[in-house]
Amino acid sequence: MFGPYSGGGGVPLPQMDADTYVRTIAAMPPHPLAPPPDSPRTPHTYVGFLPVFGDLPPLTGAVLQEPVPVPPEQRADQPVAVATENSAPTRPQLCAPYDDEVEATLRAMETNPAERPSPYFLETTQGGRMSALVRASMIAFMGEFSRKNKLADGTLQRAAYFLDRYLSVTPESDDALQLRLVGATAVFLAAKYEDQYTLRKIDASMVAARCGYTSETRHKMVSIMETEMLAALGFNLGGPTAYTFVEHFTRYYGDGEEEKQLKEAAHRVADGTLLTYGFHRYLPSMVAASSIFLARLHELGHEPWSNDLAELTGYKAIDLMGCVCDIYSQIACPRFALLQGKNKRVCKSTSMQGMNMMA
């Protein structure tokens, strides 16, 4: 854990300590012994896309005999499912292998040291030349740049991921123009990764102009920085972010208004963590699960966690305590514009403070 962000304003909320946290998760109503048929682990959205083949009768010459209808409970060729009190919810057999492969791949990638930022890159690689507030101002600039150009969802999360990895291996100067170039290039690179049609919205020349470059060859500055960043990242761009895991954990959500609000709120919580130096030390899946926890607590007012969510995410409520408490400690800061609107992920106070330091 780490202390509250020191650069924000506002009156801090009381810390959510272990006792408060445990009381919160224990205040849930008891869970039923058997999961409902529309469990989050049941990929009902896949059913319409999977071919269903009935029992084909044998062919004798050119004669096709009609099968005799048999009640479902008397079908001898169907396995009998025996439900017990301890039965775990299961996915349809046709979907399970694919779903499990995706899960295993994401978990392996997020724990790969080669694709993770250094835990203390500001203190080590940057040698104290860059403060947590300057980094936060870079994220604020990147968020504004991403929103103004209406870049793909998930771009800011991936751009921040690229930035932290780049700063983990590349010492940077404190030149404001250079810092803007680094941040904007990270957004440009992330946007192209997330959406193949990004170049229809922005190009290298527009990116350079947004940073403050005015020469006719300004696009070359972005191209050079992009090459340097790709080399620093080892050309490994596909690591999962908290956005990836929020999408993964809510993949069975329907089109209901409540589910949409929960998903959007979880994304806003996860985006808010980008501004605070230190959250990169948590695994993206834990940040995503903690964001869903707080979004449910805010939207539903009760039952922030359940057995189905524990199975889906791989985290019990008690496992999330540290991350949830760290996020909760930031909510009082004005710069952590939590759950206040779809596009209000970065507050103006942090942006203005950071821009003054970068100017």
UniProtKB/Swiss-Prot annotation:
The name on file for this protein is Putative cyclin-F1-2
Q: Which UniProt keywords apply?
A: Cell cycle, Cell division, Cyclin
Q: Which GO terms describe its biological process?
A: cell division; G1/S transition of mitotic cell cycle
GO MF: cyclin-dependent protein serine/threonine kinase regulator activity
Species this protein is from? Oryza sativa subsp. japonica
What is the gene name? Answer: CYCF1-2
Highest taxon of source:
Eukaryota
**Residue span of the signal peptide, if any?**
none
Q: Which family does it belong to?
A: Belongs to the cyclin family. Cyclin F subfamily.
Pfam families from the UniProt entry: Cyclin_C, Cyclin_N
Q: Which GO terms describe its cellular component?
A: cyclin-dependent protein kinase holoenzyme complex; cytoplasm; nucleus
